[in-house]
């Protein structure tokens, strides 16, 4: 029987939804979607030689098995995955193009002032939170997200004009350093809020690893673009390139919104099968509330307060480890070029390991061991790492601990951490999450930096400080485990029928 004849009515309607969402252009997602449909219908990918059918797992086509086990369950979902991947790729590529300029501006602003610039970043975060709260009060998601990116694009172009006018005052350099630090956390927080608002809990377990891989690929492509173009264009002229990539993210946002709406509007049953609930009318309205609603939401929810503790411990221990790394590498090598080479090798190892885990293992790990153990795995790893540093604070140990910690965080813990927000309300996804990811995160950075400096000033060696961090990592692991279990309870409660006795609000 021809493959076309084997399509169900729901497949046909979803195909019509695809056309509504993407017409008139055809993207790579269309080709992938058609290939998967053909495979599901018993066909083969035309990439294979004629007559050759690559199979496995009970005779199923190999690519079908690979896609189903690592990514989307159906071609329509694969399209959304492609747009989300592209969105995160462009976002982090844009950031990593300007990140080297930020580091240079940090030096230009005075190395002796770096701790004050960290504090300035925290104060800037305090100003951003009410600004974001005001925006979400006035506009719906499809309106305020593009406006936020227009704002950041305008900021980039303003700095471009300032640098082109040879305005190189130290205050401009410091302002750029602080702005990029705010920009980084803010855009990533908003991205994951939007993902939590787009995909269901079940979809997030399968797709977040691959979506995160898009960010990793962007983080690799950004420095590569910078290294390739900076010789010919100069660092300042890379700012419009960063702005152009940021503009592309708005296309991805509109496509993802259209994908969700088209799926539910054309066939609500098919939308439910994909894990998309019927359209919530409140999603079409602005969220309203106070501009400081994020703070209030956190204070009223023990679940969100637990996430705050998780982020505080995460950022504090990461700062401790960063200071340990700086001390050990400084004492191991006198040559700045050698130190740079060590850091570059570590970054490459982290990104390579992260990308492989995100694409092939993240979803399986979360589904296999559950949210609790997934979230606790990296704190337990770091607890072991600090214990090792307490015994042997040497280069080999810090390199292994940092590479494994960073790769595990990006590949496993970050996607799982973002899943904590899938089960909360829309207002909490945007307002509370933004407060936690910016003010709480940078607050933890700032406080822990001064605490570490105080411990050093008190005469404690790096090994002693590492041992002090061990129980903190244990507390972090316990909180992470409990939050993961709580998230699973809330997800089950949300999936239960309205009158089911199991349906309750654990928060």
Residue ranges and their predicted role:
Residues 138-151, 367-378:
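Cytoplasmic membrane-interface "Motif A"-like loop-to-helix N-cap segments
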Residues 137-138, 197, 231-232, 367, ...:
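Membrane-helix boundary and inter-helical linker elements of multi-pass secondary transporters
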Residues 34-35, 44-85, 111, 138-143, ...:
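Intracellular loop-helix junctions on the cytosolic face of multi-pass helical membrane proteins
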């Amino acid at each position: 029987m021809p493959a076309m004849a084997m399509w169900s009515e729901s497949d046909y309607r979803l195909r019509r939804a695809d056309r509504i969402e993407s017409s008139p252009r055809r993207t790579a997602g269309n080709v992938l979607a058609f290939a998967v449909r053909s495979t599901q219908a018993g066909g083969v990918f035309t990439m294979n030689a004629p007559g050759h059918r690559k199979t496995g797992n009970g005779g199923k086509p190999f690519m079908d098995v690979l896609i189903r086990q690592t990514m989307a369950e159906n071609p329509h979902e694969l399209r959304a995955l492609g747009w989300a991947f592209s969105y995160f790729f462009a976002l982090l590529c844009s950031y990593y193009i300007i990140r080297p300029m930020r580091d240079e501006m940090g030096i230009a602003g005075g190395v002796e002032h770096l701790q004050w610039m960290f504090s300035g970043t925290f104060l800037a975060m305090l100003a951003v939170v009410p600004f974001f709260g005001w925006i979400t009060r006035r506009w719906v998601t499809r309106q305020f997200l593009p406006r936020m990116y227009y704002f950041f694009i305008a900021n980039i172009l303003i700095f471009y004009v300032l640098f082109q006018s040879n305005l190189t005052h130290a205050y401009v350099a410091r302002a750029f350093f602080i702005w990029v630090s705010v920009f980084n956390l803010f855009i990533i927080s908003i991205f994951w809020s939007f993902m939590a608002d787009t995909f269901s809990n079940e979809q997030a377990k399968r797709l977040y690893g691959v979506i995160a891989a898009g960010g990793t690929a962007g983080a690799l492509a950004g420095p590569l673009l910078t290294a390739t173009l900076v010789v010919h264009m100069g660092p300042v002229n890379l700012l419009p390139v960063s702005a152009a990539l940021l503009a592309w993210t708005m296309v991805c946002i509109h496509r993802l919104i259209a994908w969700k709406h088209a799926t539910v509007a054309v066939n609500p049953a098919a939308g439910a099968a994909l894990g998309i609930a019927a359209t919530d009318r409140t999603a079409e309205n602005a969220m309203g509330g106070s501009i400081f609603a994020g703070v209030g939401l956190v204070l009223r929810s023990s679940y969100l307060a637990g996430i705050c503790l998780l982020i505080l411990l995460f950022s504090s221990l990461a700062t401790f480890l960063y200071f340990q790394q700086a001390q050990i590498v400084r004492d191991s090598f006198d040559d700045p070029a050698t130190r740079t080479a060590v850091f570059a090798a570590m970054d490459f190892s982290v990104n390579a390991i992260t990308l492989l885990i995100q694409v092939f293992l993240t979803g399986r790990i979360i589904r296999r061991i559950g949210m609790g153990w997934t979230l606790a795995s990296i704190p337990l790893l770091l607890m072991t790492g600090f214990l090792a540093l307490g015994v042997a604070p040497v280069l080999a140990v810090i390199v292994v601990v940092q590479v494994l910690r960073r790769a595990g965080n990006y590949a496993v813990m970050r996607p799982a951490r973002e899943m904590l927000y899938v089960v909360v309300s829309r207002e909490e996804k945007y307002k509370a999450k933004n407060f936690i990811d910016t003010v709480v995160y940078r607050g933890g950075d700032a406080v822990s930096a001064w605490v570490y400096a105080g411990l050093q000033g008190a005469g404690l060696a790096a090994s002693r400080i590492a041992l002090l961090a061990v129980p903190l990592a244990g507390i972090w692991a316990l909180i992470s485990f409990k939050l993961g279990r709580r998230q699973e309870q809330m997800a089950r409660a949300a999936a239960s029928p309205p009158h089911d006795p199991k349906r309750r609000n654990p928060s």
